[in-house]
Amino acid sequence: MRQTIKQTTLTVLLTILCSATMSSQELLDDVISRVQFHGYAQGGFNYTHKAGEDTPTFELKRVLFWTNAQITDRWSFLFMHDFSSVVQEFYTDYRLTNNKALTVRLGQFKNGLSYENPLSPTSMEAIDVYSEGVTYLTGCGSDPLLGVQYGRDLGLSLFGETNNGKLRYEVDIMNGQGINKRDGNKEKDFIGRLEFRPVKGLNLIATGQIGRGHAIASSLYMGTDENGDPLIKEGDNYRRNRWTAGFDYKSKAFNVHGEYLEGKDASVTSRGAYVTGNVPLGKGVDIVGSYDFFNFNTALGMDQHKVIAGLQYWFYKKCRLQLQYVYKSAYTTKTEFIHGANHAIMAQMQIRLDYAGKKK
């Protein structure tokens, strides 16, 4: 009798253990299927000739890692860190509709201003990544009033698409101060974005921003007032409006995108345009070219022309080697905007890896 009880008890325990083991494995498989991991690095060598001086230097521009988790079929979360700088993004998305018509996003993410800003550097033709106007107007780094914010901000976004993806919209409500920072004033910045795809391969984009900035430093681009003081000083709140209109066309023969941009900081107007593209030559090799014009202050004539020409070789999926010549017609010092030619030869390697768990 005792032997029978022992055997029965052992059988029950083994059954429970096997069931728990299977449940744990199923849970682990489910978690793995919902999580994706991504990472890339960009680094290389730059040789610059400016103001009669030559500057050769190796650069490690970006080392990014990010993971996104699909918590439910509607709810997801993303975290991104740049090991060469700071935490870049952390946000959660929740899809409110059964289709893709409306999703809400809360956290820190790229703002929707301009065509280029939301795009990854791994997909851009230029080693410099974005055009001068996009870099300046979206807070990617060249505007001293805002500082280096990588085109990102803290806030709330509503976005979605309709008509089988032909129409896409986005509305952002942002602090306007950049990454990992509290708002510097009481006002919020509003950014709108509208995309329309009338035919296969063509995307038309219009974006705009209305808001008030809080200056973290003065800027030589703003000029001075009648007393010789900076027009916008550190700590000042000022009007900051922008708008853009652009296009993107992709085909087997060539890819090209371009945009007109304009900004208003207090009473200072900036505007410009660019066109960038590439032509595949075969076997992973592309010709890359870009023309870029931007006037940082139209009243003071702070205009700059920029030309890029080069080659890129895709040796594995999203991994490539890039070699480019860059010409600019102007440059800045700490106190001056100078019209003068400067040249650069840039070489860069890009490595990107993506991992997604198998969906059940």
Across the structure, where does each feature detected by a protein language model lie?
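Sequence/structural signature of outer-membrane beta-barrel proteins
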Residues: 44-50, 74-76, 113, 174-181, ...
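Outer membrane beta-barrel transmembrane domains
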Residues: 279, 284-314, 318-326
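Outer-membrane beta-barrel "beta-signal"
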Residues: 339-360
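Detector for outer-membrane/organellar transmembrane beta-barrel domains
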Residues: 197-297
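Bacterial N-terminal signal peptides
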Residues: 11-20
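Bacterial N-terminal signal peptides that target proteins for export
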Residues: 1-10
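Outer membrane beta-barrel
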Residues: 26-48, 53-176, 186-191, 195-204, ...
